[in-house]
Swiss-Prot record:
The protein's name: Baeyer-Villiger monooxygenase
Purpose: Catalyzes a Baeyer-Villiger oxidation reaction, i.e. the insertion of an oxygen atom into a carbon-carbon bond adjacent to a carbonyl, which converts ketones to esters or lactones using NADPH and/or NADH as an electron donor. Thus, can convert bicyclo[3.2.0]hept-2-en-6-one into the oxidative lactone products 2-oxabicyclo[3.3.0]oct-6-en-3-one and 3-oxabicyclo[3.3.0]oct-6-en-2-one. Is also able to catalyze the sulfoxidation of methyl phenyl sulfide (thioanisole).
Residues the UniProt record annotates as site (Transition state stabilizer): R293
Sequence positions that bind NADP(+): A59, C60, D61, T183, G184, A185, S186, A187, I188, Q189, R206, T207, K292, R293
Length: 519
């Protein structure tokens, strides 16, 4: 398809994004007998986060047999925690196995989409043209748009600058003085991967992280053969991994003080590698473990102990040419800056492009904080669902479990529309959205994410946790098993518009009636 070719089509469902959420939605649509759908992807291939993040050492911190679809088990995972290239290959395999290729529209970034209150459908403008859809599933994910802090003087830096999610593989770090900004999940994988080759590595750490050892190993050929021959063993392995994490949830959500034992394990992990008391003090968090995402690595601390690594216990505040200045005044020279500063999680950029029934964008609606009914649907945005929406994140388990629960909800949502018949839309009642989010926030009050004494990317600008689910994945699955129509307004075309259709066919008259709302 030529660039900017104009496409005008109407589909039953448009899915935005082709990571785990988007491909999972596509598989579920086909299983529901829906083939009239497209998957709009801004890049040139599938993979989402696992396509965009290809930095050295990139891997998942959830065991691979749990970080995969239940309907697409993979007996060939090479390691307990497989690397980015294997996860991306798995997603390509899913696209092929389930016949998703004909539905994929690559290089089709959504520029704007708006709800048509007369036609009861979404008009979607992409870089390749315009299409309309009865239902839109936004599966862009919270880790899709990198966040780079606005550092004074950064434009004066003469060297190389890039974000971990936009790694420049053409730039050779060997022999360079490199500054790593941030100490999150990406940084703890990058640091040990580049430390042996760089001349000097300076880590700017605003807040230290709790790091637990990562018990990773190669999965033997015999194990893989067993999983191929007896698929039930793969299911059993997955079930055990899931069950262990479900049991851990109580400590995060109801009894944070029980995490003290886990803190001692993390401190021993640090002490085994970091012998310098001053460096240990820099790396020891002053908040409860679990308040920020617990990181897994058995190589991070050993790398920080190497003689060519400096840890600055302060965030980067200014750049003066090739000199980087921390908030505490510490200075360091660098040839390259790598930002491991996370993503736009609580202010997802896609929200600025989605215009609802009242003419406001989703970003404007969420200005006071993200809210959605059961993590997926927002009031004023009919027939629109977000996969991995507000308060669907997890602090200790696999997001694929949450995605599959949301896909159950999506499937029932579409069934309800079919039962209602005709041109119909469902719009969450504001009271239902408020009630759901009140329940979530009340449960959040006791969790370690709210009481642990830290500021994390789970929190929005007002300090409210709009990211994490304060319960087990089994609880969320029960909450999203069925759509309760009492929580929705049913929208239909106004009678005048319906009655005018025959006349419109004969005269070409344009009807402009508003939609009728049913209880």
């Amino acid at each position: 398809m030529a660039e900017h070719e104009q496409v005008h089509e109407h589909v039953r469902v448009a899915v935005i994004g082709s990571g785990f959420g988007g491909l999972g939605a596509a598989v579920r649509l086909r299983r529901e007998g829906i083939t009239d759908f497209v998957v709009l992807e801004r890049a040139g291939s599938v993979g989402g986060t696992w396509r965009d993040n290809s930095y050295p050492g990139c891997a998942c911190d959830v065991p691979s047999h749990l970080y995969s679809f239940s309907f697409a088990p993979n007996p060939e995972w090479p390691r307990t925690f497989s690397g980015q290239e294997h996860i991306r290959a798995y997603l390509e395999h899913v696209a092929d196995t389930f016949g998703l290729r004909p539905h994929l529209r690559f290089d089709s970034e959504v520029k704007r989409m708006a709800w048509d209150t007369e036609q009861l459908r979404w008009e979607i403008e992409t870089v390749r043209g315009t299409l309309t859809a009865d239902v839109v599933v936004s599966a862009t994910g919270p880790l899709s748009d990198p966040k780079v802090p606005d550092i004074p003087g950064l434009d004066t830096f003469p060297g190389k600058v890039f974000h971990s999610a936009r790694w420049d593989h053409d730039y050779d770090l060997a022999g360079q003085r490199v500054a790593m900004i941030g100490t999150g999940a990406s940084a703890i994988q990058i640091v040990p991967s580049i430390q042996p080759k760089v001349d000097r590595l300076t880590l700017f750490q605003r807040t230290p992280a709790w790091v637990m050892p990562r018990v990773d190993r190669a999965i033997s050929g015999a194990e893989r053969a067993l999983h191929r021959a007896l698929p039930a063993t793969t299911k059993l392995r997955r079930g055990l991994l899931w069950g262990i994490r479900e049991l851990q949830v109580q400590a995060f959500t109801k009894h944070p003080n029980e995490l003290g034992f886990v803190e001692q394990i993390a401190k021993r992990n640090m002490g085994a590698a970091i012998k310098d008391p001053a460096l240990r003090a820099k790396l020891t968090p002053d908040y409860r473990i679990g308040c920020k995402r617990i990181l897994l690595s058995s190589t991070y601390y050993p790398a920080l102990a190497k003689p060519n690594v400096d840890v600055v216990a302060s965030g980067l505040s200014e750049v003066r040419g090739s000199t980087l200045v921390a908030a505490d005044g510490t200075e360091a020279e660098a040839d390259a800056i790598v930002f491991g500063t996370g993503f736009h999680v609580t202010d997802m950029p896609i929200a600025e492009r989605v215009v609802g029934a009242d003419g406001r964008t989703l970003a404007e609606t969420w200005k006071g904080g993200m809210e959605a009914l059961r993590g997926g649907t927002a009031a004023g945005f009919p027939n629109f669902m977000t996969v991995i929406g507000p308060n669907t994140g997890l602090g200790n388990s696999s997001m694929i479990l949450m995605i599959e629960s949301q896909l159950n909800y999506l499937a029932d949502y579409l069934r309800q529309l079919n039962v209602l018949g005709g041109r119909t839309a469902l719009d969450p009642r504001p009271a239902a959205v408020r009630n759901w989010n009140h329940r979530v926030q009340e449960r959040m009050k006791r969790t370690v994410w709210n009481t642990g004494g830290c500021t994390s990317w789970y929190l929005d600008a007002s300090g409210r946790n709009t990211t994490v689910w304060p319960g087990t994945t089994a609880e969320f699955r029960r909450e999203t098993r069925r759509v309760d129509l009492a929580e929705y307004q049913v929208l239909r075309p106004a009678p005048a518009q319906v009655g005018a259709k025959a006349a419109e066919a004969d005269t070409g008259a344009d009807t402009g009636a508003d939609a009728e709302v049913s209880a």
